[in-house]
């Protein structure tokens, strides 16, 4: 397998969220996800790089749907890095946090990236994601969704279902606590 001619293979790391890395000397380093290496206090660090398209074309291995869109939230769920952009949930390959392209286009693997839109009759721009009770809750301004799948969450078994339809303030991220999830909403001049 190879990449089709004239097909872009990379995601611009300047448009992707940056990393904050705690170094051995107790300080923090803010850096792009660019694959660079550096040494501090005799400790070497290798910054990860964004994965590249290694096979297929824009149809068989499409660009992740977050490209060119504003990211509303970043999260981890079931060993995947996740992003919310518009109505989409985008998750990396399982265990490979910066890989958003499939390894192969000849078959579907359980580890493949996930890129799925919410299914609702209303426009639901997803604002926040909260891992809760081994599931993932998604919040838009007027609806809440639950991401479900099998014991292993894959691109072929994922589903996003509406659970409730309460207003939620997009400026405040919901918080899970015990068996509850707390989120704010506006009521007049109060939250």
Regions found by a protein language model. Name each.
Residues 46-79, 84-191:
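Beta-propeller and closely related beta-pinwheel folds
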